[in-house]
């Protein structure tokens, strides 16, 4: 015969742990037993959650709450006092998470790192491929980059696009080719509305849509907008008809 903890092969095995059910029963009895109340204290009848307790006067007997219920009452009183602050904290947390979900913070790129889809220029000498070297970029909110973005967005207007096609450029100018004077003109800080004399010769929307379907050699503005050409002299004419650049 083998002793406890030893198998037939001679290998020692740890003994089985004691069952947890008796321990749980003892713990439940320990928690429930102090909670029992009721009964009487001499001539006093205590409630369900009360018991007899001695006071300073040995002859006086009174009923007092059980320790567990007294602790729960104290916790409830403390929570009621701080309920307003707790509600404010919960509302603040909910609003903060909703703001982070609806309005995420913009992605910031460190210095020297180009944005996705924007290649960094190479060195002036041409050593190395573009996008791998060059001076570190400024922050996204620097005034120079802000002016470049405003200048690039302003090229979508009718006047800028018309001037580029009239000069035969056939496309937009990059922000690096824009002069400082044009940057001040298109900047929101220095942006001013044109006068009537500068825009009274511009065609209407319908006329401009018809002009886009014609070649530059066939473009002749209607009689309603004939007059002094924009950027030209009054004597410039071709066979009695004044030709205007395509707007």
Swiss-Prot record:
**So which domain of life are we looking at?**
Eukaryota
Where found in the cell?
Answer: Membrane
**Name of the protein in its database record:** Uncharacterized membrane protein C3orf80 homolog
Q: Name one GO cellular component term.
A: membrane
According to the record, the signal peptide region is 1-35
Biased segments, Low complexity type? 111-120
Membrane topology term reads: Single-pass membrane protein
- Mark out the compositionally biased spans (Gly residues): 161-171
Residue stretches spanning the membrane: 82-102
Which segments carry the region annotation Disordered?
A: 109-176
The reply to whether NADP figures as a keyword in the UniProt entry is no
Q: Which organism is it from?
A: Mus musculus (Mouse)
**Entry keyword set:** Membrane, Signal, Transmembrane, Transmembrane helix
Q: Which Pfam families match?
A: DUF4719
Q: What is its main location?
A: membrane
């Amino acid at each position: 015969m083998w002793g406890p903890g030893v198998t037939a092969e001679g290998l020692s095995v740890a003994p089985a742990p004691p069952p947890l059910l008796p321990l749980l029963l003892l713990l439940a009895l320990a928690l429930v037993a102090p909670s029992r109340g009721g009964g009487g204290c001499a001539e006093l009848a205590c409630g369900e959650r009360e018991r007899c307790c001695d006071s300073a006067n040995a002859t006086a007997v009174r009923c007092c709450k059980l320790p567990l219920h007294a602790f729960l009452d104290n916790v409830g009183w403390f929570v009621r006092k701080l309920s307003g602050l707790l509600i404010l904290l919960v509302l603040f947390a909910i609003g903060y998470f909703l703001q982070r979900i609806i309005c995420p913070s913009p992605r910031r790129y460190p210095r020297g790192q180009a944005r996705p889809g924007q290649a960094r220029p190479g060195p002036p000498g041409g050593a190395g491929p573009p996008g791998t070297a060059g001076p570190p970029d400024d922050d996204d909110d620097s005034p120079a980059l802000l002016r470049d973005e405003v200048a690039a967005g302003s090229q979508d207007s009718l006047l800028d696009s018309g001037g580029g096609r009239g000069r035969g450029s056939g496309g937009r100018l990059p922000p690096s080719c824009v002069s400082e004077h044009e940057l001040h003109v298109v900047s929101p800080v220095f942006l001013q509305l044109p006068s009537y004399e500068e825009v009274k010769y511009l065609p209407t929307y319908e006329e401009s849509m018809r002009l886009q379907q014609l070649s530059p050699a066939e473009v002749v503005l209607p009689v309603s907008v004939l007059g002094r050409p924009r950027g030209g002299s009054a004597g410039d004419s071709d066979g009695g008809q004044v030709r205007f650049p395509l707007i």
